[in-house]
A protein has these predicted regions:
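N-terminal pre-domain/capping segments
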Residues: 1-23, 28-35
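Structural motif
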Residues: 18, 47, 83, 139-140, ...
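C-terminal alpha-helical cap/extension of soluble enzyme domains
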Residues: 60, 165-172
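Short, electropositive alpha-helical surface patch
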Residues: 73-83, 103-115, 138, 142-143
């Protein structure tokens, strides 16, 4: 299935009109994608049947968050789930560039309790060891992984992408 990254209601409508079945809904794509507005989510649900995976990210500039930023993201997650997002894309890292298991687990519990899907986003591309990271994500129970193979674009990370797909593709 093709998933298109969208930064607005209009982007999602255009994707839907082109036959896309799933979008990752963001705001501020120029900042790498931040949490979208509830209004965008509500309107997309109202005007299309496209599957929506909503980004949960409080700010640009890395994937280690203060306690207040994390709390804000958790509140946004609960609202997005309550308003019908089909899935959620998020990622938390520790200062040493490993997966923050505790924060990911709390988010996953909220997502899974609502019967939705969880994607670990491109925070993966900032991890220190992609093999350790993907095994952690599988153990935690993520459904999908969004990565460019730890490079700026997927073409440059194709060798890592191919290896991860070969070794772990049936697990995440």
């Amino acid at each position: 299935m093709i998933e298109v990254c969208c930064g607005s209601f209009e982007d999602a409508m255009m994707a839907s009109e082109c036959g896309v079945k799933r979008v990752e809904l963001n705001s501020a794509l120029s900042l790498g994608g931040l949490t979208p507005s509830l209004g965008s989510l509500i309107m997309i649900k109202q005007y299309s049947d496209i599957e929506i995976v909503s980004m949960v990210r409080a700010r640009a500039g890395g994937f280690c968050y203060t306690n207040y930023q994390y709390e804000q993201m958790l509140e946004n997650l609960k609202l997005l789930l309550a308003y019908g997002t089909d899935g959620v894309s998020f990622g938390f890292l520790n200062e040493d560039r490993t997966i923050d298991k505790n924060r990911c687990q709390e988010f996953l519990e909220n997502v899974k309790n609502e019967g939705r899907k969880a994607t670990f986003h491109r925070a993966f591309d900032c991890t220190r060891d992609p093999y350790e990271a993907i095994e952690t994500l599988i153990d935690l129970g993520f459904d999908r992984l969004l990565t460019s193979g730890q490079e700026a674009i997927a073409e440059e990370g194709i060798h890592l992408l191919a290896d991860l797909q070969k070794k772990y593709g049936n697990q995440i």
